[in-house]
From Swiss-Prot:
Originating species: Vibrio atlanticus (strain LGP32) (Vibrio splendidus (strain Mel32))
Protein name per UniProt: UPF0178 protein VS_2364
Similarity comment: Belongs to the UPF0178 family.
High-level lineage: Bacteria, Pseudomonadati, Pseudomonadota, Gammaproteobacteria, Vibrionales
């Protein structure tokens, strides 16, 4: 298992949790973003900077993901592509997307996009809470223990 992180929108506190887990377990971890993401100098922790542009980082992650890999993302379409390739996808709030749940999440996302494009203000996600951080760390630990 390798960990791929959609680092463009990944909160710093979640990136730090991922780095600690990678250091502790030795799992290979790569942060992918269209900007420089500083990572500690470790043999198993890497950063890839892709050109700026719509979904370029997502496309790079999908291209490199192999069955059994874990992708950290809150991007629902990216999670769907990863699951289709046989990978796992975990949100920065600790929600594990599955084959059974991802289509419903895509439908909700598309509905909210339609609402926003028609001028209805839907608001954004709430701030990352301490509970979200704990859920993420616990779920990540469980996934790494299974590998």
């Amino acid at each position: 298992m390798k960990i791929w992180v959609d680092a463009d929108a990944c909160p710093k506190v979640i990136r730090e949790t991922i780095v600690r887990a990678a250091e502790r377990t030795g799992v290979e971890c790569t942060f992918v973003a269209n900007h420089l993401v500083p990572v500690p100098k470790r043999n198993n922790i890497h950063s890839i900077q892709v050109p700026s542009g719509f979904d370029i980082a997502d496309d790079e992650i999908v291209k490199r993901t192999e069955p059994g890999d874990l992708v950290i993302t809150s991007d629902i379409p990216l999670a769907d592509e990863v699951i289709t390739k046989g990978g796992q996808a975990l949100s920065s709030r600790g929600e594990l997307y599955t084959k059974e749940t991802i289509k419903a999440r895509l439908n909700i996302r598309d509905f909210m996009d339609t609402m926003r494009s028609s001028g209805i203000q839907t608001g954004g996600p709430s701030a990352l809470s301490q509970t979200d951080r704990r859920e993420f760390a616990n779920h990540l630990d469980r996934l790494l223990a299974k590998r």
